[in-house]
A protein has these predicted regions:
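Surface-exposed cleft-lining segments at the edges of enzyme active sites
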Residues: 181-192, 251
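Catalytic alpha-helical scaffold of carbohydrate-active enzymes acting on polysaccharides/glycoconjugates
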Residues: 1-118, 123-177, 194-286
């Protein structure tokens, strides 16, 4: 059976959405909800052979809940970096990016007691046409998993353009059929796909020379809306924007969450979980 890789972008959605919307710069994280979501992920992995996985964690979690990062590392998972805050790197100067990256890496290394060698940009947004951000990244980590593409050739071409070199672990993104919108192998896309569409994308990834690799988030493994912002928290946005964001959150916290574990289990009937990314750089990195 071929391998299917699973990685988690480990972030507190409620904290990060409020920051994106300008409601706060930072505030206490929902550590109990993060812990419950981690435990749901761990139960899923244990029920499917006990493979270990890679958790791309925001630095703020390591700052506020170092014991949770230590536990994830102690249970055998790879701790990788998902920036300090969940900010869009394409909106940051190289200097701001460098400062946030170093802050995140030092918090994650201290909390996990592990080397932290992998990185994924929040929302996969990191400038790919300008080299400054990747040059900085290559000084601090061994691999990046922020590149979306539909062929191994595209990933190799991008990887070859980087100096200093950095290993690229791409995420497959393509149209499941002609004229359909481009979809990624993970997140909301995976929740909304039918099982057949997900299986088709996994097959297409393999045919394109890319080891199938699904990314998911803690809030997708729970269906209790524990990462949703309340109407009261959204109220400072004004009635119209608050109502919009309150409704919009269903996309992340409600629609398809209950059926996700069964869908993943069904996909795993034809695959085995691939394990930590840092232990599989040879099949994955281009
Ligand atoms: Zn993220």
């Amino acid at each position: 059976m071929s391998k299917l890789f699973l990685s988690i972008d480990f972030e507190d959605f409620s904290h990060d959405l409020g920051r994106d919307l300008g409601l706060w710069e930072t505030r206490p994280l929902r550590i109990a909800a993060l812990t419950r979501a981690y435990e749901a992920i761990e139960r899923f992995l244990q029920a499917h052979g006990g493979a270990r996985a890679t958790f791309f964690c925001t630095g703020i979690i390591a700052e506020q809940a170092p014991e949770l990062i230590a536990r994830i590392a102690a249970e055998g998972h790879e701790i990788a970096c998902h920036h300090h805050f969940h900010d869009c790197i394409d909106q940051e100067t190289p200097e701001a990016f460098a400062a946030n990256l170093q802050k995140a890496l030092s918090a994650l290394r201290a909390a996990s007691g592990q080397p932290v060698t992998g990185f994924r940009a929040p929302k996969f947004r990191i400038p790919q046409s300008r080299s400054a951000h990747y040059t900085l990244l290559a000084k601090h980590v061994e691999y990046d998993s922020s590149y979306l593409c539909n062929s191994a050739e595209a990933a190799r071409h991008f990887s070859a353009s980087l100096a200093p070199p950095l290993k690229i672990l791409p995420i497959f993104a393509a149209r499941p059929r002609a004229l359909a919108p481009k979809m990624r192998l993970g997140g909301t896309y995976l929740k909304l796909f039918s099982r057949a569409t997900a299986a088709r994308l996994i097959k297409a990834s393999t045919q394109a020379g890319l080891a199938p690799h699904i990314y998911l988030h803690p809030y997708e493994f729970v269906a209790d809306q524990s990462f949703a912002l309340s109407r009261a928290e959204l109220a400072p946005l004004g009635p119209a924007r608050a109502a919009y964001w309150h409704a919009r959150q269903s996309q992340w916290h409600k629609i398809g969450n209950r059926s996700l574990p069964q869908k993943l289990s069904a996909l795993l009937q034809n695959h085995t979980l691939g394990g930590r990314l840092d232990e599989n750089l040879t099949p994955l990195a281009l």
